[in-house]
Regions:
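Dynamic helix-loop-helix/coil hinge segments at AAA+ ATPase domain boundaries and subdomain interfaces
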Residues: 179-213, 541-545, 624-627
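Short glycine-/polar-rich loops that comprise or flank the Walker A/P-loop
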Residues: 227, 277, 317-319, 354-359, ...
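Conserved NTP phosphate-binding and transfer environment spanning the P-loop NTPase/kinase superfamily
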Residues: 359-487
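Peripheral, non-AAA+ core regions of ATP-driven protein-machinery
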Residues: 492-683
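Substrate-engagement module of ASCE P-loop NTPases
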Residues: 301-317, 344-354, 387-393, 599-600, ...
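Extended, charged/polar low-complexity intrinsically disordered regions
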Residues: 2-200
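A short helix-turn-beta junction within AAA+ P-loop NTPase domains corresponding to the substrate/partner-engaging
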Residues: 335-368
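Conserved ASCE/P-loop NTPase catalytic core
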Residues: 203-333, 338-342, 356, 474-489
Length: 683
């Protein structure tokens, strides 16, 4: 790359980042250039690139790149060149040879032996002090810079002649959280999101906000203790990339494991993975079919409380659990024919109690397959520096941040609230590590967190358990009292009637025409400052307009009695009716208008999935519905769970089929005020 090309590639954010975090950033296209020729993790490459290429000067970068390539050529051992490497150490006769390799340690008969992966020797002498300093050497191993010497061992008669003189894990020596937080404060939230994505190797300019948030959610297990994440989606979307490549503190398992490996030996002499690593991830979860049931049983307790029983004493760990897997069907097919945990193996899928402990279901089908334009050529943090930041943030707690501005809805039970709080906390650490967040920014995190937990609960509900039926998840603004319901995108649009409550002032209503045709409408009232006038949209006409006018006249005549005189006199009411079936049925919907107006005036939503039937006279007398069977059948088919019915129609309810009665609960009313109170769930 020429100097001119380099200057074109840089943007304002690159310059701002290199100034704020000098020496801790690297150009990500360099990583890909080196990665092509070296089969080492990204954090290893960036350790070297950060050491030799942390500059904005193109000539310095090119010189540093040459040093990195030379270092990898000289010091990185290819698996098929182990004999050459061993011979080189032997020829030095006591002097050390430096190389990069993954080092594991095991205890054999009270003596520690190191195993160097590509050096291909399982009995290398190592000081116990390194084992004490870096206990990950005992489980999974650590990529390190190793100084190796050859020394004839009299006891083994030359059998084990290799000794590690010095071992340096590939990671930064120290991390300053205050410096990191101060640096973060110099950037806007949008800028920081883009920086984190570039650090991961992605180009944010080709992503919308939601896709950015999905990518960032993959980092939560690295930043939040005891966080349980699942992501299922198409192949080649980089599901396990964050765990595998972005941190030396995460372990990725590609097959079944044992209780001893996960949670430690019964004797207590060797710790399990959950006590050693920050994240334990399972790739290709479908391959876990043969995993012992005991592992899931122990994980169930661990995922709930972070504790587990091995031997006589209970033990604890703070590793997060992540599960990644592939979907084999389009998402709409999965939603319509089953549930979203079907790709899981039986040992997990059939354990609803375990699934209920998952904090977030990341919709992997929304993430595109990796393509060239998704990768960045701009600057991001050196990965080992960013990994240390996320690791240091694990000690901090942001779970109470939500309470500054919001409360969670009644359908979120204790486990749901815990999941949402942990997701918000994790996203705070990734995006707002300095703790400064506006109400609008926090609202975005809360909504995103609620959605991911609701996706878990919706699947549990589909699996057929009555205890999970409350899934209308919401959160409320403490200042305004406004309640917002959060859905899951993949389930939208199947029923005309939403399962969540509508905004205050909106209701569903139905009618049956003289020819037996049934109509289904969503009536929406918006209040603005005014003088007590009714303003009807152009689509509202004929019988419907007349019934609305009668209901408004009745409401106006009773405004003082209802305690709403001032609010009605100082407001104008804008009315719109959305024909959900587009069949233009003449509708008498006076009671629905009255309830909608009452809802708007009280700033209180009507109970979810409620249909309001009936009309009224100018004096407030209720008119019965021509027939119940047809509108209730249509209502049931489109997701209605509850119907307000004039008490005059009570005798007709005996004609309604048992199927409808099983799915739609009737609520009878005798006057408009009673209808409004019952619709709003008020006494």
């Amino acid at each position: 790359m020429t100097s001119e090309e380099s200057s074109i590639a840089q943007d304002g954010l690159d310059q701002k980042l290199t100034q704020a975090f000098d020496g801790k950033v690297v150009r990500k296209d360099l990583v890909r250039k080196v990665k092509v020729g070296a089969n080492v993790p990204v954090f290893v490459l960036e350790f070297l690139l950060g050491k030799y290429c942390a500059s904005s000067d193109e000539m310095a970068i090119q010189m540093g790149l040459k040093v990195v390539n030379d270092t990898l050529a000289e010091n990185y051992i290819r698996p098929d060149e182990f004999m050459k490497a061993q011979s080189k150490v032997e020829q030095l006769q006591g002097a050390t040879h430096t190389f990069i390799d993954k080092v594991k340690v095991r205890l054999v008969d009270s003596e520690y032996w190191a195993e160097c992966n590509n050096f291909n020797h399982k009995f290398v002498h190592i000081s116990p002090q390194y084992v004490r300093d870096y206990d990950r050497l005992l489980t999974g191993g650590v990529w390190s810079q190793v100084d190796m010497r050859f020394e004839y061992d009299e006891e083994s008669k030359g059998k084990n002649p290799f000794w590690i003189s010095k071992l340096q894990p590939i990671q930064i020596a120290s991390f300053d959280m205050d410096e990191y937080r101060t640096g973060r404060a110099a950037f806007s939230s949008d800028e920081w999101v883009d920086i984190v994505l570039r650090t991961m190797g992605y180009e944010p300019d080709v992503m919308d906000r939601r896709l950015k948030m999905l990518f960032l959610t993959r980092l939560i297990p690295l930043a939040e203790r005891n966080y349980n994440l699942v992501e299922l989606g198409p192949r080649e979307t980089g599901k396990s990339y964050a765990v595998q490549e972005l941190s030396p503190y995460a372990a990725l398992l590609t097959g079944p494991t044992t209780v001893a490996n996960m949670f430690g030996h019964m004797s207590g002499k060797q710790k399990g993975m959950v006590a050693i690593w920050d994240v334990v991830a399972f790739d290709e979860v479908a391959d876990l079919q043969k995993m012992p049931k005991e592992v899931i049983t122990t994980m169930k307790t661990y995922c709930e409380s972070g504790t587990f029983q091995r031997g006589k004493e209970a033990d604890t760990g703070d590793a997060s659990i992540a599960m990644f897997g592939n979907t084999n069907q389009p998402i709409d097919v999965m939603v319509q024919r089953g549930h979203l945990f079907e790709p899981m193996p039986d040992v997990i899928r059939d354990d609803m109690a375990f699934i209920d402990r998952l904090h977030y279901y990341l919709p992997g089908w929304e993430i595109p397959k990796m393509r060239p334009d998704l990768f960045t050529s701009h600057y991001g943090f050196v990965v080992d520096y960013f990994a240390e930041a996320l690791r240091a943030l694990r000690k901090h707690n942001f779970t109470e941040t939500l309470d500054k501005h919001f409360t969670l809805g009644s359908h979120l039970k204790t486990r749901d609230q815990k999941a949402v709080r942990k997701t918000v906390s994790g996203l705070m650490k990734v995006i707002y590590p300095h703790g400064e967040v506006t109400k609008e920014e926090l609202g975005e995190l809360v909504e995103f967190a609620v959605e991911g937990r609701r996706r878990v609960k919706e699947q549990l509900k589909k699996m057929g358990s009555f205890e999970y039926y409350q899934t209308s998840f919401s959160y409320s603004d403490k200042e305004t009292g406004e309640e917002k319901f959060v859905g899951v995108p993949e389930q939208g649009g199947r029923d005309l009637v939403a399962t969540d409550p509508l905004a205050p002032g909106s209701v569903y209503t139905g009618t049956i025409g003289a020819d037996g045709t049934v109509g289904l409408y969503r009536l929406e009232i918006t209040m603005t400052t005014g003088t007590g006038k009714l303003k009807v949209a152009g689509g509202v006409r004929g019988t419907m307009k007349e019934s609305i006018s009668r209901a408004f006249s009745y409401l106006s005549s009773k405004k003082v009695e209802f305690g709403m005189g001032k609010d009605i006199d100082n407001s104008d009411f804008h009315v719109e009716a959305i024909d959900l079936l587009n069949n233009g049925v003449e509708a008498e919907i006076g009671v629905a208008f009255f309830v909608a107006a009452f809802s708007a005036l009280r700033h209180t939503p009507v109970t979810a999935a409620t249909l309001i039937l009936g009309d009224l006279s100018i004096q407030g007398n209720i008119k019965e519905v021509r027939s119940l069977t047809e509108p209730l059948q249509l209502a049931m088919d489109n997701g209605v769970k509850r119907a307000l019915v004039p008490i005059e129609n009570k005798r007709q309810f005996l004609e309604v089929s048992g199927d409808i009665m099983e799915h739609v609960d009737p609520v009878f009313y005798g006057d408009p005020k009673a209808a409004a109170f019952k619709a709003l769930g008020m006494n």
